[in-house]
């Protein structure tokens, strides 16, 4: 069936009181950005729902994009017909016949914005329900939890019918929850944490630490490719590449082995906080899960967090690895995350890192290096890339094959 528009329903936005207008405006902007490649599409965000007028665009492709827009609870592809009862009946029947399977139940749900229309909601429900019962053998009416709800909206500019309700991404529109930076490695966890941050409306800039020649160009490309996939939920993302080689080499040379990881993490967090301040961000997200690795014990977190007063947000804190992997698979980042390119978090990992580092010793050993000078050099060398959903940085088949040779 050729649809004329997609009717979008809000989720949490309905509870936002006086701020609801701002949330709806942001959702409208995000939806337009997500659908920018489709010529002729019109997006109109209203108080109770958002309407996407297709004007001939491919409804299936548009709906695939809408599934990734945070703030959308669900949506329905709709057909517009004239305010003529015969046309309404014919379209309603065609919709039901397209979906119907033996034993299916249904109901009609009518809303009437145009109070001048000749039939009220109850009358229209009866007319359409009776017509479908007469023409679809075996179908039954069920008012509570039917298999099919045929929605009919009588508006001023026509009648709109829909027979499907497709689940959206939920959450809040990206941009309504403020701005933060995300410490993005090439692993499984940090992209999932970024997904959860954006789902709560936070606009994220990705901070990635790059340590050539110890980390490869493929590792950098993988991080950018992960960002491109995450950009599908926000339209575009700023990717901030921070050189970290000299800092890691200096730490390895001057800091006791057991504290290498702790001091590296302290410097990473210092740099992330500095980037956040430069970009007027109010927090730092990471992919830490309590107890998962040595740097993610409470003692390690305390020793590392010591370097900044900026909020450190950990969406995955209480999640098991199996739960995180399941989400990564669902958001299409898992296959990239497991590609065998080491990031800077793994290349200088000591054989026996401190799982319970002492805070005072951490402060002491950090003074063995020129923190300010190393940080300034890294910040001066950072590179910013604007990444969009369709950008491609990694030919996976070629690179994986090359890795195996």
Curated annotation (Swiss-Prot):
CDD domains: PPase_ThiI (cd01712), THUMP_ThiI (cd11716). Its main location: cytoplasm. SMART domains: THUMP (SM00981). ATP binds at residues 183-184, 208-209, 265, 287, 296. It catalyses: [ThiI sulfur-carrier protein]-S-sulfanyl-L-cysteine + a uridine in tRNA + 2 reduced [2Fe-2S]-[ferredoxin] + ATP + H(+) = [ThiI sulfur-carrier protein]-L-cysteine + a 4-thiouridine in tRNA + 2 oxidized [2Fe-2S]-[ferredoxin] + AMP + diphosphate; [ThiS sulfur-carrier protein]-C-terminal Gly-Gly-AMP + S-sulfanyl-L-cysteinyl-[cysteine desulfurase] + AH2 = [ThiS sulfur-carrier protein]-C-terminal-Gly-aminoethanethioate + L-cysteinyl-[cysteine desulfurase] + A + AMP + 2 H(+). One of its GO terms (cellular component) is cytosol. Transmembrane segments: none annotated. Keywords: ATP-binding, Cytoplasm, Nucleotide-binding, RNA-binding, Thiamine biosynthesis, Transferase, tRNA-binding. InterPro entries: Rossmann-like_a/b/a_fold (IPR014729), ThiI_AANH (IPR020536), ThiI_fer (IPR054173), ThiI_N (IPR049961), THUMP_dom (IPR004114), THUMP_ThiI (IPR049962), tRNA_STrfase (IPR003720), tRNA_sulfurtransferase_ThiI (IPR050102). The keyword tRNA-binding applies. Catalyzes the ATP-dependent transfer of a sulfur to tRNA to produce 4-thiouridine in position 8 of tRNAs, which functions as a near-UV photosensor. Also catalyzes the transfer of sulfur to the sulfur carrier protein ThiS, forming ThiS-thiocarboxylate. This is a step in the synthesis of thiazole, in the thiamine biosynthesis pathway. The sulfur is donated as persulfide by IscS. This is Probable tRNA sulfurtransferase. It comes from Levilactobacillus brevis (strain ATCC 367 / BCRC 12310 / CIP 105137 / JCM 1170 / LMG 11437 / NCIMB 947 / NCTC 947).
């Amino acid at each position: 069936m050729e649809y004329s528009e997609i009717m979008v329903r809000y989720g949490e936005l309905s509870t936002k009181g006086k701020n609801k207008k701002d949330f709806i405006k942001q959702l409208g902007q995000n939806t337009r950005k997500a659908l920018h490649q489709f010529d002729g599409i019109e997006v109109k965000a209203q108080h109770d729902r958002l309407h996407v007028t297709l004007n001939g665009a491919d409804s299936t492709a548009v709906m695939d994009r809408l599934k990734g827009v945070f703030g959308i609870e669900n949506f329905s592809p709709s057909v517009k017909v004239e305010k003529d009862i015969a046309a309404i009946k014919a379209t309603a029947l065609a919709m039901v016949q397209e979906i119907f399977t033996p034993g299916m139940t249904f109901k009609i749900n009518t809303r009437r914005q145009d109070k001048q229309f000749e039939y009220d909601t109850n009358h229209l429900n009866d007319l359409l329900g009776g017509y479908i019962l007469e023409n679809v053998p075996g179908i039954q009416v069920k008012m509570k939890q039917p298999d099919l709800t045929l929605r009919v909206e009588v508006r001023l500019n026509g009648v709109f019918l829909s027979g499907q309700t497709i689940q959206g991404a939920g959450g809040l529109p990206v941009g309504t929850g403020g701005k933060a930076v995300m410490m993005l490695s090439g692993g499984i966890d940090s992209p999932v944490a970024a997904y959860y941050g954006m789902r709560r409306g936070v606009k994220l800039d990705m901070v990635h630490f790059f340590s050539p020649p110890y980390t490869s160009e493929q590792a950098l490309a993988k991080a950018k490719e992960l960002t491109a996939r995450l950009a599908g939920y926000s339209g575009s993302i700023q990717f901030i590449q921070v050189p970290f080689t000299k800092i890691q080499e200096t730490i390895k040379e001057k800091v006791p082995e057991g504290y290498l990881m702790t001091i590296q993490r302290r410097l990473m967090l210092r740099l992330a906080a500095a980037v956040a301040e430069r970009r007027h961000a109010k927090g730092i997200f990471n992919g830490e899960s309590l107890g998962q690795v040595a740097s993610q014990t409470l003692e390690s977190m305390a020793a590392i967090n010591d370097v900044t007063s900026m909020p450190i947000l950990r969406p995955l804190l209480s999640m098991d690895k199996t739960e995180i992997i399941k989400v990564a698979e669902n958001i299409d980042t898992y296959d990239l995350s497991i590609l065998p390119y080491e990031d800077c978090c793994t290349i200088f990992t000591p054989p026996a890192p401190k799982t319970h580092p002492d805070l005072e010793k951490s402060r002491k050993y950090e003074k063995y290096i020129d923190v300010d000078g190393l940080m300034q050099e890294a910040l001066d060398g950072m590179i910013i890339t604007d990444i969009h959903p369709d950008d491609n940085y990694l030919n996976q088949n070629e690179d994986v094959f090359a890795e195996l040779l």
